[in-house]
Swiss-Prot record:
<feature type="modified residue" description="Phosphoserine">
    <location>
        <position position="72"/>
    </location>
</feature>
<dbReference type="GO" id="GO:0090267">
    <property type="term" value="P:positive regulation of mitotic cell cycle spindle assembly checkpoint"/>
</dbReference>
<dbReference type="GO" id="GO:0032991">
    <property type="term" value="C:protein-containing complex"/>
</dbReference>
<dbReference type="GO" id="GO:0032133">
    <property type="term" value="C:chromosome passenger complex"/>
</dbReference>
<feature type="compositionally biased region" description="Basic and acidic residues">
    <location>
        <begin position="604"/>
        <end position="617"/>
    </location>
</feature>
<dbReference type="Pfam" id="PF03941">
    <property type="entry name" value="INCENP_ARK-bind"/>
</dbReference>
<dbReference type="GO" id="GO:0015630">
    <property type="term" value="C:microtubule cytoskeleton"/>
</dbReference>
<feature type="compositionally biased region" description="Polar residues">
    <location>
        <begin position="385"/>
        <end position="402"/>
    </location>
</feature>
<keyword id="KW-0175">Coiled coil</keyword>
<dbReference type="GO" id="GO:0005819">
    <property type="term" value="C:spindle"/>
</dbReference>
<dbReference type="GO" id="GO:0000775">
    <property type="term" value="C:chromosome, centromeric region"/>
</dbReference>
<feature type="coiled-coil region">
    <location>
        <begin position="506"/>
        <end position="759"/>
    </location>
</feature>
<protein>
    <recommendedName>
        <fullName>Inner centromere protein</fullName>
    </recommendedName>
</protein>
<feature type="compositionally biased region" description="Acidic residues">
    <location>
        <begin position="434"/>
        <end position="445"/>
    </location>
</feature>
<keyword id="KW-0137">Centromere</keyword>
<feature type="modified residue" description="Phosphothreonine">
    <location>
        <position position="382"/>
    </location>
</feature>
<dbReference type="GO" id="GO:1901970">
    <property type="term" value="P:positive regulation of mitotic sister chromatid separation"/>
</dbReference>
Length: 880
């Protein structure tokens, strides 16, 4: 690059300006986030874990609000906020561009041509933000200097005693396997630094894992454990040479541009692009796989990129086996999940075989998951154990070993979580199960002396908490505010804290300790089994979700292919239709030309035919006129003949009608005479019948009168006999009473004379009540018998009389000749019902009862109806 060229100089000035803007942005925005994270980490270090978690009130409105806001807070920056589905509102070109922006890490090609990947970490970002304000002036001055400088200052990072001891022990183990290399500087990098991206990448700095603490897991649940475990970054002293690094240059541009953002003049391995720095520090903790759309897995470009990544991984594995002078402390499991690439490590095969094998298995599992199209969703976060300058050193008389200190540090770091604003809002089951598992994993590493034994308690009063209670507590813990999330994110196991220990005063301390350890071991085994079961269920659910998403995406892609095929077919059909239309137009033109020629020939023929037709028409018209004249004369002659014939017929008809009228008149006269004679005869018969009936009536009345007189006479005689009988009985009764009174008086005198006692009460039994009737009945009323009333008012409760022997007399008008005459007269002279009663309106039950019921308009009787109702809506039913 020529220094005198104006274009590159302007480009360098533009880069300087952009970089200064980025530094100001980091100072004003990102630094505030880093300060908040640092304060949260300090609170996590110094907080007291024995306090009870503060629970938020759970109201129905809050529950509903939480359910509605389950959308992840961490969304892709390049994603359209309106876009909701993969198959809508995005063309294929925009999707490809978006996929590259999401999945492609930021690379910058240096002057030597090596593409190197670098991302900002928490430590680097915090250091750069802290030194940004102080180094702006030096950056402007160094940009004009233009002389290459070599940065040799070192960054001093204080570490705790346990970390220093573990790092020294690890370095002593690695001295035999690693070749000597100049130690220039110790630095702390995140998992994302120095990851090989393409196959043509040059030599990269190797990585040494000094201390990688992991909970022992079985191969069965190792995949889940790696996806959910919390990584720990231990600080060790590693060195790397600036002069030997392929990415380092001594150009004046690098000195001028990179100096403002370096902490204590530490030159990073590669320059960072502005696009990579725009991403927030909190977003650096989120997996890139979760932001890559699923559609990228089914495209050919994504498959080619996966192949190139696998080849770069193989090259990185080979390069990782070569010894290098510099080393980094990187948590491989989190780095591989975050970047989806292999990270080479420089650990000897003979040292720490288990720790080296686990990342390789994770790499294989990750490759399988990539090939299957199901990206994992790690929830782990990088944990950096950095001691503050005010932290106290460990006591000289410390009795715990280095391993116990590291275990305690792991337990403390294991409870750290990103702020609640960064964490993705989880569902109900995830909020219950995930914190419980992470808490139990951390509690397994806690020492036993932290447990405070509960007071002795009978076994029947021990409360065995259910699993739902722990889940409820963990769910409430996840629903707290961001300020309380750090204090309440850790909870002691309810079983470990509250389960009482059996205290036997007869046993020794050793026996008690052994029993306690045995019970603790059994509880840990039970918790481990439960945790494994929960992890298995979670893995199965994740697999089901992945399969559903793949199936849905496959259907979407198939639908797109079908739509494209339909478009192609429609396009072909349109082209064929246009071709057919063109052919039809050509044929129509040819046909029109032929038709014109044919019309000309036919026109001449038609003119000739028309001339001949006119001549023939004139001849036919003349013949028709002649024939019409002849026909008219013939019709006139026929009409005259017809009129004469009609006149003759009319005269004959008149004579015949006169004869018929005369005959009818004679017949009518004879009929009237016969009717008169018949009427006279009937009148005579009627009079004779009336006379006979009157005679019979007179005789019957006379007979009835005689019968009544006889009945009255018999009744009088009966009454007279009854009166005589009554008088006779009364006389007998009176005589009996007198005789009885005389006897009683005689007896009373005899008793008084015999006893000579005064004031005696005598009971006299008088037979008067039975001797005669106390209230004699009066004369019975004689019923009045009338000829015309049929005795309707007498004994109305009697049953029907026998027709052959009726008890009551039948009136004369209801029997005999009077009844037959009345029937004959009514038959020949029927009464006019309309004149007598008027027009009878049909009954309407609604008017009668002042109600409306549906059954009024229905026939509900069981009768056989042979005719339809006259008025269906008005005729009442007989069943009502």
């Amino acid at each position: 690059m020529g220094t005198t060229a104006p274009g590159p100089i302007c480009l360098l000035d533009l880069c300087d300006q952009k970089l200064l803007d980025f530094v100001c942005n980091v100072d004003n925005k990102d630094f505030m986030w880093l300060k908040e994270i640092e304060e949260e980490a300090e609170r996590m270090f110094i907080r007291e874990f024995s306090n009870e978690p503060e629970l938020m009130p759970k109201t129905p409105s809050q529950k509903n609000r939480r359910k509605k806001r389950r959308v992840s807070n961490i969304q892709d920056e390049n994603r359209d906020p309106v876009r909701k589905r993969l198959s809508r509102r995005k063309s294929r070109s925009s999707q490809v561009g978006t996929r590259h922006l999401r999945s492609k890490p930021v690379t910058i090609v240096e002057e030597n041509g090596f593409p190197v990947l670098q991302r900002i970490t928490r430590a680097t970002a915090a250091a750069a933000a802290a030194a940004a304000a102080a180094s702006v002036a030096s950056a402007s001055s160094s940009s004009t200097a233009g002389s290459p400088t070599v940065l040799t200052k070192k960054a001093v990072v204080e570490i705790s005693t346990s970390e220093r001891l573990s790092a020294e022990l690890q370095l002593t183990k690695l001295k035999g396997s690693l070749p000597p290399s100049p130690v220039s500087q110790g630095t702390l990098t995140s998992e994302e630094e120095l990851t090989p991206k393409k196959s043509e990448a040059g030599k990269l700095d190797s990585v040494t894992v000094n201390s990688l603490k992991a909970t022992p897991q079985s191969p069965k649940n190792r995949g889940v454990g790696e996806g959910r475990s919390v990584s720990k970054l231990k600080i060790a002293r590693a060195s790397w040479g600036l002069q030997d690094s392929p990415g380092s240059t001594d150009s004046p541009w690098q000195e001028r541009v990179l100096s403002p953002i370096l902490l204590n003049n530490i030159l990073p391995t590669t320059a960072k692009s502005p696009l990579g720095n725009i991403r927030s520090v909190r977003r650096s903790l989120i997996s890139q796989d979760s932001q890559v759309p699923l559609a990228s897995k089914y495209n050919l470009v994504a498959k080619q990129e996966n192949g190139s990544r696998r080849s770069s991984r193989r090259i990185a594995k080979k390069a990782g086996k070569e010894p290098e002078a510099s080393a980094r402390i990187i948590c491989h499991s989190y780095l591989e999940r975050l970047l989806n690439v292999e990270v080479p490590q420089n650990v000897g095969l003979e040292q720490e075989p288990v720790e080296v094998a686990e990342p390789e298995e994770a790499e294989e599992e990750q490759e399988v998951s990539k090939n299957s199209g199901c990206p994992s969703k790690p929830r782990s976060a990088t944990k950096i154990a950095i001691s503050t300058p005010t932290s106290k050193p460990a006591a000289a008389g410390q009795t715990t070993t280095v391993e116990e200190q590291e275990a305690e540090l792991d337990q403390t770091d294991g409870h750290r979580e990103p702020p609640q604003s960064v964490r993705r809002k989880r569902s109900y089951k995830q909020a219950i199960s995930e914190p419980d598992e992470e808490q139990l994993e951390d509690e397994e590493l806690q020492p036993c002396q932290n447990k405070t034994p509960s007071p002795p308690c009978p076994a029947n009063k021990v409360v065995r908490p259910l699993r739902t209670f722990l889940h409820t507590v963990q769910k409430n813990q996840m629903l707290m505010t961001p300020t309380l999330a750090s204090r309440s994110s850790v909870m002691k196991s309810f079983i470990k804290r509250n389960t009482p220990l059996r205290v036997d005063p007869k046993c020794s301390f050793v026996e008690k300790e052994r029993q306690r350890l045995e019970s603790l071991r059994r509880k840990e085994e039970a918790e481990q089994r439960r945790r494994q079961k929960v992890e298995e269920d979670k893995r199965r659910r994740l697999e089901e979700v992945k399969l559903k998403r793949e199936e849905r995406l496959r259907k979407v892609l198939q639908a797109r292919e079908r739509v494209e095929q339909m478009k192609e077919e429609k396009k072909k059909q349109i082209e064929q239709k246009f071709a057919q239309i063109d052919e039809k137009t050509e044929k129509a033109k040819e046909e029109r030309l032929a038709e014109k020629a044919k019309k000309k020939a036919t026109a001449k023929k038609m003119e000739e035919v028309e001339a001949r037709r006119k001549q023939e028409e004139e001849a036919r018209r003349l013949r028709w006129l002649q024939q019409e004249e002849e026909e008219r004369r013939h019709q006139e002659m026929l009409q005259r003949k017809k009129e004469e014939e009609q006149e003759r017929r009319k005269a004959a008809e008149a004579r015949r009608l006169a004869e018929q009228r005369e005959q009818e008149r004679r017949r009518e006269q004879e009929r009237r005479e016969q009717e008169r004679r018949e009427q006279e005869r009937r009148e005579q018969e009627r009079k004779e019948q009336e006379r006979r009936e009157q005679e019979q009536e007179r005789l019957r009345a006379k007979r009835e009168m005689q019968e009544r007189e006889k009945a009255l006479r018999l009744q009088k005689e009966r009454l007279q006999k009854e009166l005589e009988e009554k008088k006779r009985k009364e006389e007998q009764q009176r005589l009996a009473e007198q005789q009885l009174q005389e006897e009683q008086a005689k007896k009373a005198k005899e008793v008084a004379a015999a006893r000579k006692v005064l004031n005696m009460t005598v009971d006299v039994q008088s037979p008067v009540c039975t001797s005669y009737q106390m209230t004699p009945q009066g004369p019975k009323s004689i019923p009045k018998i009338s000829v015309d009333d049929y005795g309707m008012d007498l004994n109305s409760d009697d049953s029907t009389d026998d027709e052959s022997h009726p008890r009551k007399p039948i009136p004369s008008w209801a029997k005999g000749t009077q009844l037959s005459q009345a029937i004959v007269h009514q038959y020949y002279h029927p009464p006019n019902i309309l004149e007598l009663f008027g027009s009878i309106l049909p009954l309407d039950l609604e008017d009668i009862f002042k109600k409306r019921k549906t059954r009024y308009h229905k026939r509900t009787s069981s009768a056989v109806w042979n005719s339809p109702p006259l008025k269906a809506t008005m005729v009442p039913s007989s069943g009502d």
